[in-house]
A protein has these predicted regions:
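Short helix/turn-capping signatures at newly exposed starts of structured segments
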Residues: 1-136
Length: 136
């Protein structure tokens, strides 16, 4: 399983175009396997249930072989291979303001504050970024 280190520049690119570490919506299953190898956890598509490729803290959801949404979380230390390198909520909010990106607070759950920018969601624990998703 790959260990993903996400820095400020990676997050800024993600906020601008939804791409992070070469992963984006619309990619096909073979591109995902070429990028991350075979998943540790896998659930095939069944009727209306999406196919899930799980790589520790990275979950990729596909429908008819194409990425429909994905999430990255550093919440679970035992399974997480995701490291958000000290990216603060203030840093993200300043970036959004400077680039006229609309961001709104959604809710708080288990001490995590969730924000949304278009179809991108961000989660902060004690003002540190710990969760991102797109398409969900």
């Amino acid at each position: 399983m790959q260990y993903l280190i996400l820095r400020e520049d990676d997050i800024y690119l993600f906020l601008n175009n939804g791409v992070i570490k070469e992963l984006s919506l619309g990619m096909d299953k073979h591109q995902i396997i070429n990028l991350f190898e075979r998943p540790n956890n896998y659930e095939p598509q069944r009727k209306f249930k999406k196919e899930i490729m799980g790589y520790g803290g990275l979950n990729i959801y596909l429908l008819d072989g194409l990425v429909k949404y994905f999430s990255m979380s550093a919440l679970n230390n035992e399974t997480s291979n995701i490291n958000f390198e000290g990216i603060s909520k203030d840093c993200i909010l300043r970036y959004a303001d400077a680039h006229n990106l609309s961001i709104k607070k959604l809710f708080e759950f288990d001490d995590v504050e969730y924000f949304q920018m278009d179809n991108i969601k961000l989660g902060f624990l004690e003002d540190a970024l710990i969760y991102i998703s797109v398409g969900m």
